[in-house]
């Protein structure tokens, strides 16, 4: 048995997804710190979720993270906004880094796209690890900066990083 594996997300887990999204560990570093209401989640799920590709990252067949990738276009460019949702109230650094590697393996298979991540400035662990996964800071002078920040509604307390795939 593989120690780590992936499993595609489907509509059957709509309530589990909301439960994981509302865990304190996820809200702590999210732009939205409030718990998401079921009705808002259902509305988002059946409208916006179609633009998102998500899969569970499993450890010994138990979900530890959800990898998310929102795909969208800006002019002639294809973008991916990537994120991780913890399925556990607490995570360890090894599992987090392994999940990021699995997520990056998926992202690196996408071609001719720009991938963006945003990291809460208070998240000391991730603020020190983005460079090891091929990301660079998205500077304010970059042509994409204003569009990405506004389109994705990224708050002032977040840094944006990107890589060209």
Which residue stretches match the model-derived regions?
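Conserved N-terminal entry element of GNAT/NAT acetyltransferase domains
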Residues: 1-12, 153-165
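A short helix-loop-beta-strand connector motif used in the catalytic cores of GNAT acetyltransferases and
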Residues: 43-56, 65
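Conserved GNAT-fold acetyl-CoA-binding loop/helix
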Residues: 25-43
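Conserved beta-strand-loop-alpha-helix junction that forms the acyl-donor binding cleft
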Residues: 116-127, 144
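Conserved acetyl-CoA-binding loop-helix of GNAT-fold acetyltransferases
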Residues: 87, 91-106, 128, 132
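Conserved acetyl-CoA binding element of GNAT-fold acetyltransferases
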Residues: 76-89, 118
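Conserved beta-strand in the GNAT
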Residues: 62-72, 81
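Conserved catalytic-core motifs of GNAT/GCN5-like acyltransferases
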Residues: 118, 134-152
